[in-house]
Structures are given as C-alpha cells and as structure tokens.
C-alpha cells in the first residue's frame, strides 16, 4: 500500500493536527488515551489517562506516584498509549520509554488544576483499598480544613511522566475493513515512516 498523502515527516505535528480535529468533532476528553503498563513480572494493566501535552520530547500525563501505574513504571519504565476518536474513525498508538517529569513542570500543572481536583489529589491514596466512601469523604474534609484557601501545594506523591515515543502508528478506518495504517519508527534524531497492511 503506498503511503497516504497525510504521511507527514513529523509524527508529532501529525498527531497534534489529529488531536485538534478530534477536539473539534467531539470536544469531551479528546486527550483521553488508554495507557498500558506492565509490572516486573510482565503482567499488563491498562487504564484511561488524560494526556496534557505532546511535543518533541513526548507525551505527558500526571498521576499519583503511589498508584498501580506508577509502581509498574518504576519496575518496568515502558508504556503504550492508544488514542481512539470514533467521530473521526481514527486512532493513534504510541510506544516508548517513560521517565518522570521534572518537579517544576508537575508544580506548574498542579497549580492550573481546579481546587477540587487539587484537594482530591491529596485525599486519594490511589489504588489502595477503600473501606467505604465515607472514609474518602472524611479525607477530603481533612484536606479542605488543612488548606482553607486557594493555595494548595502539590503532594510529594503526585507528579508527571513523559512517554518518549519510539514508535507511533496512525490508523484510519477504510471501506471493507481495508484500513489505512502508517507507522513512524524512531531512527536516531529522525523518523522512518512506512505503511502497514490493514
């Protein structure tokens, strides 16, 4: 299959264009992606995250660093992301190594979040067992009492991660399930691009 005309040399620019089209077509959580990780034994797990930026460095997301995904990444610092936009009949898959983002970037993003989300970040011990909902609600009240104003610092157990892409695949639905697939593979400072069978 020949390369489609949209096979631009820069996959990040192509992704950002697709994301803009997805946000225009269906603005609710266009940045949502399935994040797949695996623990030290290779046991996989997957969950949805919101990707907050995509640039030449990679794809950034933020989370509790005591969560299952964070434990997986500490043991096995590789991950895959999958964005699926039904309104466009397109998806993008990203694979690569994962590193923690600098604290300054995590601080800046944390400050931009709504107050209730910052409170929730302190109150939730993500992925830990929960006895009942009242336990979590009590933790929220404790955090609100501790930080009565709008200044809520970033918890030391909360931060960001960067997926540095080594492989990015763009998929677009085709008639008769003859879909269009273009893959970019990192080669040094550039990208090797090619088409895949559907």
Swiss-Prot record:
UniProt binding sites for substrate: 52, 109, 113, 117, 177-179
Named cofactor requirement(s): FMN
Cofactor note: Binds 1 FMN per subunit.
Pathway annotation: Cofactor metabolism; pyridoxal 5'-phosphate salvage; pyridoxal 5'-phosphate from pyridoxamine 5'-phosphate: step 1/1; Cofactor metabolism; pyridoxal 5'-phosphate salvage; pyridoxal 5'-phosphate from pyridoxine 5'-phosphate: step 1/1
Catalytic activity, EC: 1.4.3.5
Catalytic activity: pyridoxamine 5'-phosphate + O2 + H2O = pyridoxal 5'-phosphate + H2O2 + NH4(+); pyridoxine 5'-phosphate + O2 = pyridoxal 5'-phosphate + H2O2
Entry keywords, A to Z: Flavoprotein, FMN, Oxidoreductase, Pyridoxine biosynthesis
InterPro entries: Pyridox_Oxase (IPR000659), Pyridox_Oxase_N (IPR011576), Pyridoxamine_oxidase_dimer_C (IPR019576), Split_barrel_FMN-bd (IPR012349)
Disulfide bonds, paired cysteine numbers: none
Domain of life: Bacteria
SUPFAM superfamilies found in the cross-reference section: FMN-binding split barrel (SSF50475)
Gene Ontology BP terms: pyridoxine biosynthetic process
Gene Ontology MF term list: FMN binding; pyridoxamine phosphate oxidase activity
Binding annotation for FMN: 47-52, 62-63, 68-69, 91, 126-127, 171, 181
NCBIfam families, per database record: pdxH, PRK05679.1
Complex and partners: Homodimer.
Chain's role: Catalyzes the oxidation of either pyridoxine 5'-phosphate (PNP) or pyridoxamine 5'-phosphate (PMP) into pyridoxal 5'-phosphate (PLP).
Family in the record: Belongs to the pyridoxamine 5'-phosphate oxidase family.
Protein name: Pyridoxine/pyridoxamine 5'-phosphate oxidase
């Amino acid at each position: 299959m020949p390369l489609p005309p949209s096979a631009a040399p820069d996959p990040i620019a192509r992704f950002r264009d697709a994301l803009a089209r997805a946000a225009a077509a269906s603005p609710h959580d266009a940045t949502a992606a399935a994040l797949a990780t695996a623990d030290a034994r290779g046991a996989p797990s997957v969950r949805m995250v919101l990707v907050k930026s995509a640039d030449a460095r990679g794809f950034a997301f933020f989370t509790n660093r005591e969560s299952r995904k964070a434990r997986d990444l500490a043991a096995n610092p590789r991950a895959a992301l999958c964005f699926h936009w039904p309104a466009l009949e397109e998806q993008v898959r990203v694979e690569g190594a994962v590193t923690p983002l600098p604290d300054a970037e995590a601080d800046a993003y944390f400050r931009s979040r709504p107050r209730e989300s910052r409170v929730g970040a302190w109150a939730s011990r993500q992925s830990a067992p929960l006895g009942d909902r009242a336990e979590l609600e009590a933790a929220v009240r404790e955090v609100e009492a501790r930080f009565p104003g709008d200044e809520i610092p970033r918890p030391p157990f909360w931060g960001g991660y960067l997926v540095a892409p080594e492989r990015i695949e763009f998929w677009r639905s085709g008639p008769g399930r003859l879909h269009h697939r273009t893959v970019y593979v990192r080669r040094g400072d550039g990208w090797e691009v090619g088409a895949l069978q559907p």
